[in-house]
Amino acid sequence: MKLTCVVIVAVLFLTAWTFVTAVPHSSNALENLYLKAHHEMNNPEASELNKRCYDGGTSCDSGIQCCSGWCIFVCF
């Protein structure tokens, strides 16, 4: 019973600590996200959504080309 209470208190503390330390960066993160989206609108070739990848069963040279990221001569 005591161990359960200690675990619950520890989880609550760590959750609260995560929120407390994340607050100063949240506005900055939204600003960076907006700037990135604006840059992608001006330069569509830089968008992550335009990157092509191969489906499973397609021959490949590296894992970067595969949608799954796994390549051993064939995408998995």
Swiss-Prot record:
Q: What is its main location?
A: secreted
Which residues does the propeptide include? 23-52
Keywords from the named record: Calcium channel impairing toxin, Cleavage on pair of basic residues, Disulfide bond, Ion channel impairing toxin, Knottin, Neurotoxin, Presynaptic neurotoxin, Secreted, Signal, Toxin, Voltage-gated calcium channel impairing toxin
Give compartment(s).
Secreted
Signal peptide as annotated in the record: 1-22
Entry keyword Secreted:
yes
Q: Which domain of life does this protein belong to? A: Eukaryota
Instruction: Recall the GO molecular function terms of this protein's record.
Output: calcium channel regulator activity; ion channel inhibitor activity; toxin activity
Q: Does the keyword Methyltransferase apply?
A: no
What this protein is reported to do is described as:
Omega-conotoxins act at presynaptic membranes, they bind and block voltage-gated calcium channels (Cav).
Give the comment on domains: The presence of a 'disulfide through disulfide knot' structurally defines this protein as a knottin. The cysteine framework is VI/VII (C-C-CC-C-C).
Which family does this protein fall into?
A: Belongs to the conotoxin O1 superfamily.
Q: What is this protein called?
A: Omega-conotoxin-like TxO3
> What's the gene?
TXO3
